[in-house]
Amino acid sequence: MDINIININKKYKNRKVLSNINLNISSGEIVGLVGDNGAGKSTLMKIIAGIVKPESGIVKLDELTFEKNRIEYLKNISFVIEEPSLYLEMSGLDHINFIAKLNNISQNKIDEIIKFINIGESLKKRCSSYSLGMKQRLALGLALLKEGNFIVLDEPTNGLDIDSSIELRKKLIFLAKEKNISILISSHILSEIEKICDRVIFIKSGLIIKDNFNLKKETLKNIILVVEDRIEFLGYISKNNNILSLEEIESNKFKINIESNLINSFINELSNKNIHYTNILISDVSLEDEYISVKRSE
């Protein structure tokens, strides 16, 4: 199922929280949504889930829209918010049985989800007695139980231990790659986004500032090196159009961002121009590197 988000705008009172949001998520793609607190991530996710109404714009799941095809739209989407909304007087098991009955889920699938939730006998107790972590496990389990064609997860590892986070990651990758389910995931834990997502969208102050950071295909590299003559080196860099970014970490120590296929020619040019350097280190560009770079460019 392809998801198309078209010209979404949202205001709260006189404050604009989303401005002309346009993005596409392909069938089977896992997309990360990254931004500071208050950037508009949760609002966008709630609009996608049909919880919040935008001022203008539309969200389409293939050709389904919330406004015209509400029942079918909601059948095809599973949504987990940062602070799960549960019926506190019902038990976790009551929630599971209710969703399973609505969606004609097999007992094998129910047993698999109960194992994933992993809260023991507490599953039979009222949700009012659950910790945040237990509520998060249950909400995730219910989303995975339903298995809509589009899963939206807002801070899904909040309250989860390491083993549960790893298990969730494996399950989401399986759903995307084996069952062609589309997934949008927001998290402040960039390492989690990096491990699971195909592509990352950066949002700031309600605006998408980059939507094509492809974690699977990026060919960018970081080069960290110490140069003997700082002025000479900076003069060379100012004339080199292949350098995508430059940061002076400390005196005479620089961090450069460059395409991987240009590294050898860059190093050869330094030698040819007698620009001497020491302690050169080459590494992949991480999501954190890109996040910092994007923030600095604004």
Residue ranges and their predicted role:
Residues V34-D36:
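The feature captures the beta-strand-to-loop junction immediately N-terminal to the Walker
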Residues G57-K68, E72-Y73:
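Conserved ABC transporter NBD signature motif
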Residues A49:
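Helix-to-loop junction immediately C-terminal to a conserved catalytic motif
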Residues K170-N257:
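ABC transporter nucleotide-binding domain
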Residues N97, K101, Q107-L123:
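Conserved ABC ATPase "signature" region
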Residues I151-E155:
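Catalytic Walker B motif of ABC-type/P-loop ATPase nucleotide-binding domains
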